[in-house]
Amino acid sequence: MEVKTLDVANFLARIQKQESTFESLSKFSPTQLKELATCIRHRILEVVSSNGGHLSSTLGAVDLIIGMHLVFDANTNPFIFDVSHQAYAHKLLTGRWNDFSSLRQFGGLSGFCNPKESPSDYFIAGHSSTSISLAVGAAKALALKGSASMPVVMIGDGSMSAGLVYEALNELGDKKYPMVIILNDNKMSISKPIGAISNYLSQILTTSIYQKIRDTIKKVLTKMPDSATYLAKRFEESLKLITPGILFEELGLDYVGPIDGHNIELIIATLQRAKEMRKPVIIHAQTLKGKGYEIAEGRFEHWHGVGPFDVSTGSSLKSSAPQSPTAVFSESLESYLTDEKVVGVTAAMPSGTGLDKLIEKYPQRFWDVAICEAHAVTSMAAIAKEGFKPFVAIYSTFLQRAYDQIIHDVGILGLPVRFCIDRAGIVGEDGETHQGLFDIAYLRSIPHMVLFAPRDNASLQQAVAFAYRYNDSPCAFRYPRGSFTLEEGVFVSNEFVLGQAEMLKRGKKILLVGYGNGVGRAYKVYQALITEGYEPSLLDLRFVKPLDKHMLNEVFKTHTHICVFSDSYYMGGVASALLEFMAEENIKDVQLKSFEIKDRFVPHGNTALIEQSLGLDTPHLVSKIKEWI
């Protein structure tokens, strides 16, 4: 029985009880589905304006996600969202409407899909371009189980730039596993519609007529005599030439679109047809980022990821903050651009890494290569070989995606590529997939790699200066998101000298060793211990590779307890480096304790609350140290 009027309260009550969204939505009329989309957008705006999050992409994907849940049962068909920052509507339709107010909060809902949060989230997501590979694997598993279910993928046009997508499409075009891939094109970066002809093609391609023509031609081809086969094949190929999806067609996939990603009736009809085809189908849907929120519709990039804001004006509710490390890095790097050998690259994060203004001012020397971290690194290796000074500005979590290239293309030849690692350490609300905690461990093992870290904005300027001067091997320096823990001006900033640490405070017995942002944490502990009558020393390690062996040999002779602080993992991290040094030097009369992060993935939430949960806030640290000594 069709629902006469959209009773949102009753509908939401049903899905809160985990009743089937699939069955409930099937009773809605197109008008009611549009009303539901409006309600979902209002809820997203309500929460994101309070908590922050990804806004414009998720507003644009609402209609498509409603269509997915109406045509496919998410309980039996794996819904796989690439990155999944656009999947808020999916969360709201799968029993999380009330809990949505906890989005990105410590202990609350993740800003991305996570099976630990809900069985409706098929797979963890956060990094781009993994969805089609996951879908291929899921389709294989379903086939092995004898299931008629199929994966349903949503992937954005930005994610289509990464090589992993085409590795998956290569196999998919050969094996023909049944699945539906929705290409959510919200930037018009793949194919822009052109007038009436484009509209006409879109209408043709979203009906069964086009597919019937293609299927009929293929059947006829098998029955034609050899003399006519050539002409028939050419006729079939000519059909591809009038579609925007030639690339996908040539890979052996069926392409539908482009369609209007906000026309709910068209979306449902297209998805239903794709479902019936029982083969890999790509639906190219064009959507508007920020759909339903007029202020966001006009400023796409600004509204991609946002902090709390006033819905009525769009104004940020964040209080003024000191200059971010990202901004300091950008300004510092620009000061060296009188040297025409200085160049830079980022992978789809120009504003996030501070290279956006440099790309605008110096387009011949700074590049955004899209979501292609591996290509970014390898291309800079060649530039370094030609005598230039490349700076690779990249988030810690995304540099992981280019690890082979760092070793094979940069490391083996010892090329002087500078890795500027933004968002190092605990990044807060983006959670497990984005915490920048691995870089020290995975870079420290690479022969001849130099690793160093600033403690505040002033020393970050010195770090950029050192990277500019250093030309003997690859090097990397890391800095946090938002701000350093250490307040500006506490210590005078000196030049970085290869492999030299800096003693900030001399005391006795207890040595607090900080690295990078860990210096700020160590300094807070230092202040607390001083008030309780202790006299610790405070050392800024500055370089974790190479270590200042002369300084370490000196201080290890005069201290009995070494406390190590760094925003990184213990395994392979700073304490590991110091323990290796102690083993090599046969130092036995010193105890060392790491206050890094142990063997666990760190969840999302406010950074201070995360640190408290990990026992890394000052009261916990001081208590542990006092108990230890």
Swiss-Prot record:
Which residues are listed for Mg(2+) binding in this entry?
A: 157, 186
Binding of thiamine diphosphate: at which residues?
85, 126-128, 158-159, 186, 293, 373
Explain how, and how many, cofactor molecules are bound: Binds 1 Mg(2+) ion per subunit. Binds 1 thiamine pyrophosphate per subunit.
**Which prosthetic group or cofactor does it need?**
Mg(2+); thiamine diphosphate
**GO terms of molecular function:** 1-deoxy-D-xylulose-5-phosphate synthase activity; magnesium ion binding; thiamine pyrophosphate binding
Any transmembrane segments, and where?
A: none
Instruction: Supply the SMART domains for this chain.
Output: Transket_pyr (SM00861)
Q: In which pathway does it act?
A: Metabolic intermediate biosynthesis; 1-deoxy-D-xylulose 5-phosphate biosynthesis; 1-deoxy-D-xylulose 5-phosphate from D-glyceraldehyde 3-phosphate and pyruvate: step 1/1
> Which processes are annotated in GO (biological process)?
1-deoxy-D-xylulose 5-phosphate biosynthetic process; isopentenyl diphosphate biosynthetic process, methylerythritol 4-phosphate pathway; terpenoid biosynthetic process; thiamine biosynthetic process
Question: What is the E.C. number?
Answer: 2.2.1.7
Residues in a coiled coil are: none
PROSITE patterns reported for this sequence: TRANSKETOLASE_1, TRANSKETOLASE_2
GO annotations of cellular component type: cytosol
**What UniProt keywords apply to this chain's record, in alphabetical order?**
Isoprene biosynthesis, Magnesium, Metal-binding, Thiamine biosynthesis, Thiamine pyrophosphate, Transferase
A Pfam cross-reference name: DXP_synthase_N
Q: Which reaction does it catalyse?
A: D-glyceraldehyde 3-phosphate + pyruvate + H(+) = 1-deoxy-D-xylulose 5-phosphate + CO2
Q: Which family does it belong to?
A: Belongs to the transketolase family. DXPS subfamily.
Q: What function does the entry list?
A: Catalyzes the acyloin condensation reaction between C atoms 2 and 3 of pyruvate and glyceraldehyde 3-phosphate to yield 1-deoxy-D-xylulose-5-phosphate (DXP).
Subunit arrangement?
Homodimer.
The record ties this protein, via HAMAP family, to: DXP_synth (MF_00315)
What is the protein name for this chain? 1-deoxy-D-xylulose-5-phosphate synthase
* Organism from which the protein derives: Helicobacter hepaticus (strain ATCC 51449 / 3B1)
Q: Its gene?
A: dxs
